[in-house]
From Swiss-Prot:
GO terms of molecular function: pyrroloquinoline-quinone synthase activity
Name of the protein described by the UniProt record: Pyrroloquinoline-quinone synthase
Superkingdom of the organism of origin: Bacteria
InterPro entries in alphabetical order: Haem_Oase-like_multi-hlx, PqqC, PqqC-like, Thiaminase-2/PQQC
Gene Ontology terms describing biological process: pyrroloquinoline quinone biosynthetic process; sulfur compound metabolic process
Species classification: Bacteria, Pseudomonadati, Pseudomonadota, Alphaproteobacteria, Acetobacterales
UniProt xrefs under HAMAP family: PQQ_syn_PqqC
PANTHER family, sorted: 4-AMINOBENZOATE SYNTHASE, PQQC-LIKE PROTEIN
Length: 246
């Protein structure tokens, strides 16, 4: 039988999910950060990850649309501002596109998502659908991977700067803002989950939501590894298929 945990025990259980399943443990990230990939493989990472970036504000708008809690909406809408900016040329999506262009990718190709891996699109879509279809508590809990992102972002920026001559500090500027935004967002979401998960079932649902989200991130890296590292099977239509790297 599942027992009711204290809020701090719940937090510990959530952190244990991240320790076991967060995407910092994925071999593709270890290759990426360790300088073991060539430029095309890094380009593949950037253009696939664009799909995730582009979906994040859609899932945040979905969450906002679902709640009648005005305070939650007010706080959550900062995430839309962070990703979309307040005027053209601002925000995380634009900064991600600058990263992709800094790697030599064509901006319109990246935005079109037509060269992304099928599994990337499916994983990203699953996240948006989850936030639309599950309870609000699960929707908020699914964002909690951000508790773990500052560490991986620091590792990524220092590793990529040290190991690739085609990467500059400007290319990676996207991540600077995330180092402030992610802890702020995660602190709020964690507090929300600790206050609103009041039954054993709700607590287990929150843990399962975070597990699901780790799977969303992991699946995207599995797809990259399968296509671009080993066995190197690039799906039809995807970046690099038939030797076309554009
Ligand atoms: O670089 C990363 O490893 C990483 C991880 C995550 C995450 O853990 O979901 C996010 C981000 N970056 C990120 O940049 C971002 O905007 C973001 C939003 C969310 C979310 O679930 O709402 N996760 C993440």
């Amino acid at each position: 039988m599942t027992v009711l945990m204290s809020p701090d025990e719940l937090e510990a259980a959530l952190r244990a999910v991240g320790a076991a399943r967060y995407h910092n443990r994925h071999p593709f990230h270890q290759l990426l950060h360790g300088g073991k990939l060539d430029k095309r493989q890094v380009q593949a990472w950037a253009l696939n990850r664009y799909c995730y970036q582009a979906a994040i504000p859609i899932k945040d708008a979905t969450l906002i649309a679902r709640t009648d809690d005005s305070e939650l909406r007010r706080i959550w809408r900062q995430r839309l501002v962070d990703h979309d900016g307040t005027q053209p040329g601002e925000g995380g999506i634009v900064r991600w596109l600058a990263l992709a262009e800094g790697l030599g990718l064509d901006r319109d190709m990246v935005i079109s998502e037509r060269r992304a891996l099928p599994a990337t699109r499916f994983a990203v879509r699953a996240y948006v659908d989850f936030v639309r279809d599950r309870s609000l508590l699960e929707a908020v809990a699914s964002s909690l991977t951000e508790m773990f992102s500052p560490t991986i972002i620091s590792e990524r920026v220092s590793g990529m700067l040290a190991n690739y001559d085609f990467i500059t500090r400007e290319t990676l500027a996207y991540f600077n803002a995330r180092l402030d935004q992610a802890p702020r967002d995660a602190d709020f979401a964690l507090d929300y989950v600790k206050r609103h998960a009041r039954t054993p079932e709700q607590q287990q649902a929150a843990i399962a939501a975070l597990t699901f989200k780790c799977d969303v991130l992991w699946a995207q890296l599995d797809a990259l590894h399968h296509a671009y590292v080993s066995p190197g099977l690039i799906p039809p239509g995807a970046f690099g298929h038939d030797g076309i790297w554009s």
